[in-house]
Structures are given as structure tokens and as C-alpha cells.
Amino acid sequence: MKRLIVGISGASGAIYGVRLLQILRDVDSVETHLVMSQAARQTLALETHFSLREVQALADVTHDARDIAASISSGSYPTAGMVILPCSIKTLSGIVHSYTDGLLTRAADVILKERRPLVLCVRETPLHIGHLRLMTQAAEIGAVIMPPVPAFYHLPQTLDDVINQTVNRVLDQFDIPLPHDLFVRWQGA
């Protein structure tokens, strides 16, 4: 069984993290470990109709963002990696500078030092040079920078179609197969 850490930061786009958890709930080969920042809790309430309790119930294990002694805070705890979806600039900055002031950034720091996959779905626009430098630095230390940028070749009809495409592409980064793809993959012209 793969253990995947799912981080949700306070950036806009909490629905991406929720949808990822919804999809993985039905994948028996994956155990999810959720950690949400305090700002993520606010964003969740502002942007969705999901309660904190409902989102936490989607995860196999939920960790308090203040618990720096949690299992996922140690490299000796085996995981398949971590995704932060969405990833705020504050969280990105904390990761790049090894400023592990809570479990979200501590778990990401552990993933990097253990050379496991870390996918950062940075959600900000427009970007200034400081943001771009942070993303470059994160990539240099081993993270995958994967902004949730929609694709249109699969002809999305709804917002769910756009969200599903991003979530499916994130799962591709961890080699997590789904019973069926959430979008139509490009087959060539």
C-alpha cells in the first residue's frame, strides 16, 4: 500500500485538494495522510460548501498542522511522497528556506531530504520575480512545480472537468493508477 501525504495550504483552490481526497478514497492501494494549514481551513470555508469535518473524513489519517511529532514528520516513516494542492506562496517559501514552523512544511522538508516525490501545485497569479525564484529553488532541491493550470484539449464542459484533469495529472506524478481516467488524454492530432 502506498502512503501519500496530502497537504492543503491556504491558497485559493481548496477544492483541488478536496477532489484529490475524494478520488483517493476509492483507491484501496493508497492510504492518505491529510495535513491542512490554519489558512486552508479558512479558505475551505470561504470557497466550498464542505465542512472541515467532511474533508477530514475523506482522509485515512488526519494530522494536526501543529503536531510536529506526527508520524509524517520523520523520514523513518515510509511514504510514497507528498502533494500540496493548492500550495500557497507562503508554504512554498517555507519549504524552500527549510522554515518548518508546522507539520505542513516539516513533512515537505522530510520528503525532500529523503528524496521522495514532492509535488507543489502553486496557486498564484500574476507571479513576480520573487515567486519565480522560489519555484526555481524548489525545483532545484527536488520538488516538482505543477501549477493547477487547466488544459483544454480534452474539451472540458464543467468546472469539475477542469479540476479532475489536474487531479488526474497529479496522481500520474506518483504512478497511482485509477480504474478509469478522469479526463480524455491527448492521443495526437
Swiss-Prot record:
One of its GO terms (biological process) is ubiquinone biosynthetic process. It comes from Salmonella typhimurium (strain LT2 / SGSC1412 / ATCC 700720). Keywords: Flavoprotein, FMN, Prenyltransferase, Transferase. Pathway: Cofactor biosynthesis; ubiquinone biosynthesis. This is Flavin prenyltransferase UbiX. Belongs to the UbiX/PAD1 family. Its EC number is 2.5.1.129. FMN binds at G10, A11, S12, S37, S88, I89, K90, T91, R123. Pfam families: Flavoprotein. Flavin prenyltransferase that catalyzes the synthesis of the prenylated FMN cofactor (prenyl-FMN) for 4-hydroxy-3-polyprenylbenzoic acid decarboxylase UbiD. The prenyltransferase is metal-independent and links a dimethylallyl moiety from dimethylallyl monophosphate (DMAP) to the flavin N5 and C6 atoms of FMN. GO terms for molecular function: carboxy-lyase activity; flavin prenyltransferase activity. InterPro entries: Flavin_trans-like, Flavoprotein, UbiX-like. Dimethylallyl phosphate binds at Y153, R169. It comes from the Bacteria. The gene is ubiX. Gene3D superfamilies: Flavin prenyltransferase-like. It is an enzyme of class 2 (transferase).
